[in-house]
Amino acid sequence: MNGNSIIGLIGHPVSHSIGQILYNRIFQDMGIDAFYLAMDVHMNVLPAFLKNSFFLKAFNVTIPHKVSIIPFLDDLDEIASQTRSVNLVIREQSRMKGYNTDYYGLDYALSFNQVEIEEKRIVIAGSGGIARTVIRYMLDHGAHRVDVLTRNAQNARRNLDIPGIGLHENIDEDYDIYVNCTPLGTLGDGDPFSTVDFRSGRTGIDLVYNPPDTPFLKRMRNAGGRTVSGLDVFIGQGLRTLELVFGIRPDSIFREYAVEALNEIRKG
């Protein structure tokens, strides 16, 4: 890599993110001349930020910008184009290309925890950009059925625009896998499946990583189910980000450093 590089995270809020601690520690230990910066960018200033983001080599994208950023980009990778959701932007001279690493993060987490998707009945809470990515992944990997739990089925139908899925404002049936794609559970607050009585042997997957053990996952485990933490998804995303931006994949240290960074930020 020639010269130094500034990369970062944009979203609102970003105070719960461990990225700044984690990536800067990795850069230091691996001798990479780069700095990671978390930036709280409100929706109404996104256009102005992007216009003046020339100082960034790349940046991760989180809520609420994963979809709204797309019109400002020059190109998308295949998965970002399919899902209409971006969580990494890489600047190549004057052009900005959007990538979807959420897909790879989910694949990493499910492989790490040995969760099979084929022929499973799956329900996903949420209808935003990350939900589109999870739906796409589940369909690509042979899910028997994919339903979406949402507060507003009409809005979800418009936002998702994916054929072959069911949209529900409440659920009263059993599924093999439950996935949280909402912010509920962040910092320990809320559970999108609070009205569901989980059965033994089911699987809960949470995209929230702070805390790594959300109220939803605790209830699933107490019911005799198994759980996949959002931290595993985050680790997969992070490894893919470093691979795309710097051509490195530090598997041996990333998980250890991610856990340390999460513990550090949770202590305040």
Swiss-Prot record:
Keyword set, alphabetical order? Amino-acid biosynthesis, Aromatic amino acid biosynthesis, NADP, Oxidoreductase
Intrachain S-S bonds: none
Q: In which pathway does it act?
A: Metabolic intermediate biosynthesis; chorismate biosynthesis; chorismate from D-erythrose 4-phosphate and phosphoenolpyruvate: step 4/7
Q: What is its EC number?
A: 1.1.1.25
Keyword Translocase attributed: no
Membrane-spanning regions, if any?
Answer: none
Which GO molecular function, any one, fits this protein according to its record? NADP binding
Top-rank taxon of the source lineage equals Archaea
Q: Where does the record place a coiled coil?
A: none
Give the matching Pfam families. Shikimate_dh_N
| Family annotation (InterPro entries) | Aminoacid_DH-like_N_sf, NAD(P)-bd_dom_sf, Shikimate_DH-bd_N, Shikimate_DH_fam
**Tagged with keyword Acetylation:** no
Q: Which family does it belong to?
A: Belongs to the shikimate dehydrogenase family.
UniProt-listed NCBIfam families: PRK00258.3-6
Q: Please name the PANTHER family in this protein's record.
A: BIFUNCTIONAL 3-DEHYDROQUINATE DEHYDRATASE_SHIKIMATE DEHYDROGENASE, CHLOROPLASTIC, SHIKIMATE DEHYDROGENASE
Protein name listed in UniProt: Shikimate dehydrogenase (NADP(+))
The gene coding this protein: aroE
